[in-house]
Curated annotation (Swiss-Prot):
Role description: Catalyzes the decarboxylative condensation of pimeloyl-[acyl-carrier protein] and L-alanine to produce 8-amino-7-oxononanoate (AON), [acyl-carrier protein], and carbon dioxide.
Reaction catalyzed: 6-carboxyhexanoyl-[ACP] + L-alanine + H(+) = (8S)-8-amino-7-oxononanoate + holo-[ACP] + CO2
Protein name: 8-amino-7-oxononanoate synthase
EC number: 2.3.1.47
GO molecular function annotations of the record: 8-amino-7-oxononanoate synthase activity; pyridoxal phosphate binding
PROSITE patterns the record matches: AA_TRANSFER_CLASS_2
Lineage of origin: Bacteria, Bacillati, Actinomycetota, Actinomycetes, Mycobacteriales
Record InterPro entries: Aminotrans_II_pyridoxalP_BS (IPR001917), Aminotransferase_I/II_large (IPR004839), AON_synthase_class-II (IPR050087), PyrdxlP-dep_Trfase (IPR015424), PyrdxlP-dep_Trfase_major (IPR015421), PyrdxlP-dep_Trfase_small (IPR015422)
Annotated positions of the N6-(pyridoxal phosphate)lysine modification: 235
Binding partners and assembly: Homodimer.
Pathway stated in the Swiss-Prot or TrEMBL entry: Cofactor biosynthesis; biotin biosynthesis
């Protein structure tokens, strides 16, 4: 059969039909202006994306440095503001140094690939974020994926390896369920077997630890010489961008070896200025971290979730994709936006509503959440 005349994209129609049949078709919906819909879906955990000081920080940087970074950080994309923010964030979390990337995704890609490579072993939790999964795939290292939070499996992979170098990668707080990694136990395994540990604190920074310093701080691993922390600026800090924090030698190596850092345009100054201002607010208002957890506990009680949340994330498992999607749309029709996680983001049969608490939720907003969620979930 000749292929002449066939569209090279004809296969997309079949794929879309399959997605629709499985209830997995995704679409974009424009976010309305602030205040028109109650937001229980975003990752703006501390409510800082709309904070006046954070907005002012972004605007001031915009006026001083311009709209874009204009180049990679090794060319023209590095400013005093980037370096000041790196110093401030490193000091806050107890790290020796920090390096800002254009996103949390590229920070993970840069760190994992540059710190592993051919001839090394990567051990990854089965539930790590997609950015860590992709980093492992790009690394050209041998990759072992271990069952979720299975420290014994991690230790076995490290103990039986032939490779001299090994790296264990994990989230500190897992994004779909909001549960915590056993960081202390994982670190003990790494130390016994001479492995580096890379921890993504995207959902831990600003919520866990003393004054919101993250789960690494909470378990006494802040600044450990064999731990590298990555995080995003798009969640608790209400901006965007990513950071790798750790020993100064790691920062120096990433500047020379992390391809997303070398070849990507630097993070826009406005995003850096906003994140820096948000960090200052967090330092001055540490109550925000506990407020997030308090609101998450209330949301879990409203939804009938038995376990007390360990983070801002409240996961309400409903089973099939169409059930979760219908519940999410029912909430939106009543003025409440919630997240809807379906495969492949979560395993088949565990489609869910993913609610996120915010420190800035008012009593009236919590009352609306109770009214809408109670009604919608009673029908799900």
């Amino acid at each position: 059969m000749t292929r002449a005349g066939l569209s090279p994209l004809a296969w997309l129609d079949e794929v879309e039909t399959q997605r629709r049949a499985a209830g997995l078709r995704r679409s974009l919906r424009a976010r309305p202006p602030v205040g028109t819909v109650l937001d229980l879906a975003s990752n703006d955990y501390l409510g800082l994306s709309q904070h006046p000081r954070v907005i002012d920080g972004g605007v001031a940087a915009l006026r001083t440095w311009g709209a874009g970074a204009t180049g990679s950080r090794l060319v023209t994309g590095n400013t005093e503001l980037h370096e000041q923010f790196e110093d401030a964030l490193a000091s806050f979390v107890g790290a020796d140094s920090a390096l800002v990337f254009s996103s949390g995704y590229t920070a993970n890609l840069g760190a994992v690939v540059a710190l592993s490579g051919p001839g090394s072993l990567l051990v990854s939790d089965a539930y790590t974020h997609a950015s860590l999964v992709d980093a492992c795939r790009l690394s050209r290292a041998r990759v072992v994926v271990t069952p979720h939070n299975d420290v014994a499996a991690v230790a076995r992979a490290l103990a039986t390896r032939d490779e001299e170098r090994a790296v264990v990668v994990t989230d500190s707080v897992f994004s779909a369920d909001g549960d915590l990694a056993p960081l202390r136990e994982l670190h003990d395994a790494c130390r016994r077997h001479g492995a580096l540990m890379i921890v993504d604190e995207a959902h831990g920074l600003g919520v866990r630890g003393d004054r919101g310093r993250g789960l690494l701080d909470e378990v006494g691993l802040a600044g450990a010489p064999d731990v590298v922390m990555t995080t995003t600026l798009s969640k608790a800090l209400g901006s965007q961008g990513g950071v790798v924090l750790g020993p100064a030698a790691v920062r120096d190596h990433l500047i020379d070896a992390a391809r997303p850092f070398i070849f990507d345009t630097g993070l826009a100054p406005a995003a850096v200025g906003a994140a820096h201002a948000a960090l200052q607010v967090l330092v001055e208002e540490p109550w925000r971290a506990q407020r997030v957890l308090d609101h998450a506990t209330t949301l879990a009680q409203i939804c009938g979730v038995a376990d007390v949340p360990s983070s801002a994330v409240v996961s309400v498992i409903l089973g099939e994709p169409e059930v979760a999607l219908a519940a999410a749309m029912g909430c939106l029709e009543r003025g409440v936006r919630v997240g809807c996680f379906r495969p492949p983001t979560v395993p088949a049969g565990t489609s869910r509503l993913r609610l996120t608490a915010r420190a800035s939720l008012s009593d009236d907003e919590m009352a609306l959440a109770r009214e809408v969620l109670t009604d919608v979930l009673s029908r799900a």
